[in-house]
Amino acid sequence: MYLRRFYFIILVYANLKMEYDTKDKTFWKRKGNDMKVLLGAVNAKYIHSNLAVYCLKAYAEKYGDTSDEISIGEYTINQQLDEILRDIYKRKPDMLCLSCYIWNLTYVEEICREIKKVMPQIIIWIGGPEVSYDGVKVLERLPEVDGVMKGEGEQTFCDLLHFYQDK
């Protein structure tokens, strides 16, 4: 547990401008209202569904102790990139978390690059088997991404929500 949290902080610190509270000895970035979080999945086919994003949402709602608004957006690799970007933009999330697999990695990377152009303040996190094995290299390759979730994501996602929530 401690090692995972240490790794989590390293990845966050690598790409975010953060403040340090010397009194509490804690880091924080966001203050204010609850966030709108979009869990995104790019599936191989229209009939497929991404179990990971539903598990993350269910776990966060049950154990997360957060009032952030969490929604799910499922897309397919057959959809036009503009259509996906338009949907994300219409939802106006503060944070976008994307699930990465071998069949959607290049598409997810393109989404990250393009959505950051139209929504520069959006926080982008990615996770899944195609990116969690070497988060540092992924962050170097994708400067638009703010962090990589490693391993089982449920508790890490809750930690992430708390990280951005008011202290």
Each language-model region and where it sits:
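Short hydrophobic alpha-helical segments enriched in small aliphatic residues
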Residues: 14, 21-22
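Nucleotide-activated donor-dependent transferases that construct or modify glycoconjugates
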Residues: 36-45
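Glycine-rich beta-alpha loop elements in corrinoid/cobalamin-binding modules
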Residues: 52, 59, 68-167
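Glycine- and acidic-residue-enriched helix-capping/strand-helix junction motifs
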Residues: 45-54
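Short hydrophobic targeting helices and cationic amphipathic motifs
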Residues: 3, 7-11, 16
